[in-house]
Amino acid sequence: MPRMFGTDGVRGLANRDLTAQLALDLGDAAVRVLGDDERSEFESRRRALVGRDTRVSGDFLAAALSAGMSAGGFDVIDAGIIPTPGVAYLTSVLNVEMGAVISASHNPMPDNGIKFFARGGFKLPDTKEDEIEAVLGQDWDRPTGAGVGRVSHDTATATNLYIDHLVSAIAPVGPDKSQPTPLKGLKIVADCANGATSVVAPEALRRAGADVTVINASPDGYNINKNAGSTHPEQLQAMVKASGAVMGVAFDGDADRCLAVDEDGNMVNGDQIMGILARAKKNAGKLNHDTLVVTVMSNLGLKLALRSMGIKTVQTNVGDRYVLEEMLRGDYSLGGEQSGHVINREFATTGDGTLTALTLCNEVVKSGKSLKELAADFPQLPQTLINVPNVDKMAAKTNAKVQAAVEREEKLLGDTGRVLLRPSGTEPLVRVMAEAETQQQADEVCDRLAKVVADELTL
């Protein structure tokens, strides 16, 4: 049977795949697996924290998840609507034993998901998720009487703690308790995707001094990600040009990612954002080992540009959890994905879109350059991606003819391009990607390779 937990928790159609009963059972199982014995003498009660995005199904799922946790003896802090990285931060700063987020990120509104954070605010490794799945729905000696947990609701306190943390990343409060405003006069547009950062991002940017025009920050339970945010940036691009803003930032539904738009409405992707921030950290002496952690999907153009700046790259599989694992293993300080997940370990344990927006805006101000100028230092090689369906995806790395074709194309491209075959994690298809000096060459290489994959691996 396939694992219940995917690359980012448990996801599915709310009230069909992800039911109230399943949420209850997940809460019940999580307290058994994630409850630890590291409590200090002052921690008489076990505690968990739950947050969610703006989907209408989040209400009943949060209630069910919290019920499972409290029935297992945990006092639950319901932080209400708050970005995923906010839950990670609060799990750490409040020193609770675990955190949980109810969100399906950039997925359509009818979907939802549940993912957990361990003490310290880190996503769970596969082994812990498997332990939760193994005890799911099992009976056990649950507490009674005073051993049963309570559920408290405190959205305002949780949100304010998180906003304070975000702003302090670029504007630490001075000894006189005054709040610096490093973004003063910076005119920007923020697209909140009608999601979890609809309150947090505008407030954090304004407190840092920015002149912010906010769009898609009126969630109604049904409009999350709908023609908005990082997956649909067209409205943001138009607003930046129409308003005369110097840049724009776009978040997804749970605000763990951020993409940007320059003053001409051109997209600035996660690779370019990482490049800008990596160079800034290196110049400040804060880029550990002069290395940026990226995934296999990061554009070769980023790696070539960074190499010319004396910055190395380490590559992982797709998924911000794998980026973080490598960052922890190698003691690296910055990493992320082309999709806009950026992990800044100085301030966060997971991708944080609002933090990325603040630090990117800060670098624009400090550099004295426009975002367009900064992004131009990290040109992207033309890229073509073809999905080849209905194939034996597991044979992509072992089929002799496919591997011979890969070697031919790699030899043809040399150091000026690359190819990548990536089996889908959920479907019987292989993603064929090619990067080259020209779009025509990328198209031709990708077409040839996709044909070989189809001819050799079709089921």
Curated annotation (Swiss-Prot):
Domain of life of the source: Bacteria
The record's account of how the chain is modified after translation: Activated by phosphorylation.
UniProt cofactor note: Binds 1 Mg(2+) ion per subunit.
Cofactor(s), names only, from the UniProt record: Mg(2+)
Summary of the function given for this chain in its UniProt record: Catalyzes the conversion of glucosamine-6-phosphate to glucosamine-1-phosphate.
Family the entry assigns: Belongs to the phosphohexose mutase family.
Name of the molecule in the record: Phosphoglucosamine mutase
Gene: glmM
